[in-house]
Amino acid sequence: IAIRADIDSLPVAEANEVPYKSKVEGVMHACGHDGHAAMLLGTAHVLSEIRDQLCGTVYLCFQVAEEIGAGADEIVAFLKSIGGVDQAIGTHLAGGDPAGVINLPNGPMMAGALGFEITVKGVGGHGSRPDRAVDPVKPACDIVLKIAMIPAQYHNPFDTCVVSPCQITA
């Protein structure tokens, strides 16, 4: 089996004053990534103590660059190069579960990250003469709204589906 944890820090300045505050200025382990690393290191410790009771191989995968949609490619390529694994498990902290509870559902548990880019082109002009311009702003807004409606209109409400357009650059 393969057990994976994301461990990257984020380019966010940690403003709170807590004992576990990042010691590196301008970056922090938000989203629980330090906890993910600790869980996988704890798993490594426990598995090493019961090594003689295991029948099979466990790959512990520490994934970097998860927040930018990268890092997993190397892990997947490695696992394919060894013939694959029977099961892959991803770790993630969840605030809804009580301390000490491990939630291991059958199938996906959280949304994944996938980037996409759409270019809407216009022709500049003055706001007082919209007839002489091609305004890209309103069509771009329409696109965002239509994308956000995909889960409600095109997916079974009993299946999980999240689509989050998160950035517009103009």
What are the roles of these predicted feature ranges?
Residues 10, 17-28, 34-35, 41, ...:
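Histidine/acidic-residue-rich, glycine-tolerant segments that coordinate divalent metal ions
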